[in-house]
Amino acid sequence: MPESGGSRAQREHIPNPGTGPGAETPPTLPAQVIRAAGADTVSGAAGAVGAAEAAGAAGTTAKATQTARRTGFLVTMVLGGLTALPPLSMDMYLPALPAVTDSLSAPAATIQLTLTACLAGMALGQLVVGPMSDRWGRRKPLLLGMVVYVVATAICALAPTAELLIGFRLLQGLAGAAGIVIARAVVRDLYDGVEMARFFSTLMLISGVAPIIAPLIGGQVMRFTDWRGIFVVLTGVGVLLTLVVWKWLHETLPPGSRHTGGVTDALRTMRGLLADRVFTGYMITGGLAFAVLFAYISASPFVVQEIYGASPQTFSLLFGLNSIGLIAVGQINGKLLVGRFRLDKVLGFGLAVIVLAALALLLMTLGVFGEVGLVPIAAGLFVLMSAMGVAMPNTNAQALMRTKHAAGSASALLGTSSFLIGAIASPLVGIAGEDTAIPMAVVQVVCAVAAVGCFLGLCRPWQRAGREAAGL
């Protein structure tokens, strides 16, 4: 697989000016006239034509570059918004959980199912929407998903019972999954090689801000209205994103590249992807890295506040700093590392840092270094979270580079596996109660070591490095 190559849209989807079906064909001189004119005349004419073509090409290239920059910015903003919508839907709602419990007169455990339902919907929805986008293109399934998201979110704002709220949170997650899976597929349609890895790092910057600001937005909304107002705001965000997608996100999958089969064909495509050892290796590696992240999200409120006695404000500050570290390293990955080093080498380095940070956290929680305070634990979590900015975008890029004609299905498998593996691992951090951080560290070490094992055992990066060095 090539590790460079720029935008696939420039090579495949955008016809060169003057060569498309609507371009005028320049007149061709008869052979008799050319022979009569002599070699010198032909040479002079060729030189003049070449100069004219060069000048025209330069002007066309400049215009194309400006258009590409404007288009690239719009695509970045649209796809960034789509990938940020699911974390907004999850995290804006968190400050309202106690209020929902009181308002609907339901047990806390029942209201917590509204989070589980939304998360499950996001995981399963990707399996449905991904193959749909490979068959009907990216725009139609995305617009349909956005419309359903808006309707489901609006009904959540009006839900009179906990059961109805749970049901439409599930539908909200199913529909919101369209943004996640199709955003990745669009990136695969438009970019290849290191350009794709860079774009994923940019998306991580945008989507990484969402979990930081979402609880703050939810808390501010609660100052002026009740919990239903949060869903009203999310409905407005959904309407705005739907209009933006309809206006500015054009179709990126041409009809000739689409799959024509039904469910059977989609399942066959996914089975073929899973049969690809290297793709499956990157998929599981990314899922296990995501599980390390989920373990942190699930356990850190209790570890930081209950065990080490930090205030909620201190926890929010540390959570924000860790998110900033992830975003910053993601930008370093996209701007500096990708293109200068092989993606597998960068990914391997990131996974190694995650393993070392997780081991350090485990040793500290076991008391190997004596009694440690919050600062060393916070430092270990910061290093671990920052390294995610290298691991996560590069596993996605490497996996999708192997799927030229099934990016939707591949994106669905990547997203679903990450959510499912994370959902399985995250409850394990509370298996020993809220009084110890050891389960969190154990889950992180096991998942991190398993991620390295999958990367080495299934992806086998040294084999591709040897083939690339040999020019194969």
Whereabouts are the PLM-identified features?
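Juxtamembrane intracellular "pre-TM" segments in multi-pass secondary transporters
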Residues: 61-68, 252-283
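Helix-breaking motifs and short loop linkers at transmembrane-helix boundaries and internal kinks
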Residues: 103-105, 137, 158-164, 175, ...
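Conserved MFS/SLC helix-loop-helix module at the cytosolic interface between two early adjacent transmembrane helices
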Residues: 124-163
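Helix-to-loop junctions at the C-terminal end of transmembrane segments
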Residues: 126-137, 329-344
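Structural signature of the two symmetry-related core transmembrane helices
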Residues: 140-155, 235, 345-361
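Paired small-residue
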Residues: 148-155, 163-171, 375-380
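Helix-loop-helix hairpin linking two adjacent transmembrane segments in secondary transporters
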Residues: 160, 164, 201-249
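Cytoplasmic helix-loop-helix junction between adjacent transmembrane helices
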Residues: 168-207
